[in-house]
A protein has these predicted regions:
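Short, cysteine-centered beta-strand-loop-beta hairpins and adjacent loop/turn segments enriched
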Residues: 63-65, 124-131, 156-157
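Surface-exposed amphipathic alpha-helical segments
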Residues: 143-189
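Short N-terminal segments immediately surrounding and downstream of signal-peptide cleavage
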Residues: 23-39
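Bacterial N-terminal signal peptides
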Residues: 10-17
Length: 189
């Protein structure tokens, strides 16, 4: 990944976190299009050579004490399929929470030309928090990177909450300025 592309991703994440327009220049190359949920703040972010991650929590919560969380991850250069990633994630969840059932696939179809999958994992009682943890995942296999957005609850969400967050995940997408059929939207100047 070039330094310029890393800077663009950081700008998109930074401006999305504060609800502003994505950037003053058009997006270049492959990008994850995701916004910070209204009423959420950045609780944690980390950048490593092969991955960037941002965790959003409700404005009055922290990543140490949360009831809801949205996690956005970009794995640079990862060539896994959404199915492979889901299988690995489910295996890791079962190791941490023996009560986890199999991953439940919600959607498995290309979006904007990219292999995409949405699934659910449910831990009835997380051994670390002693609370339930229910998480929906949306994974997109890009050409340059692998993208994952998670919505987690530490309680049983209502049907209205599930509908709201499925709508949020539907809006998450990947674009690429180098491929006409997958072009990125023009940003505000």
């Amino acid at each position: 990944m070039t330094k310029r592309r890393t800077a663009i991703l950081q700008c998109v994440a930074h401006f999305a976190a504060f609800g502003a327009s994505a950037a003053s220049a058009d997006l270049e190359n492959e990008n994850l299009l995701v916004t910070a949920p209204p009423g959420y703040k950045v609780g944690f972010s980390d950048k490593k050579p092969n991955m960037v991650m941002t965790e959003f929590v409700p404005a009055k919560e922290t990543v140490e004490n949360w009831t809801e969380m949205v996690t956005v991850q970009v794995f640079f250069g990862l060539k896994a399929t959404p199915q492979q990633f889901m299988d690995d994630m489910a295996k890791n969840w079962r190791a941490a929470c023996p009560e986890v059932a199999e991953a439940h696939t919600v959607a498995d179809a290309p979006e904007n030309g990219y292999p995409t999958r949405v699934w659910l994992l449910d831990c009835p009682k997380n051994p670390q928090s002693s609370k339930p943890e229910i998480t929906w995942f949306k994974a997109v296999q890009g050409n340059d990177s692998f993208y994952l957005v998670q919505k987690a609850f530490r309680f049983e969400p209502s049907k209205e909450q599930i509908t709201q967050w499925m709508s949020y995940l539907r809006k998450v997408s990947v674009c690429d300025s180098r491929i006409a059929e997958r072009a990125c939207p023009k940003t505000a100047n």
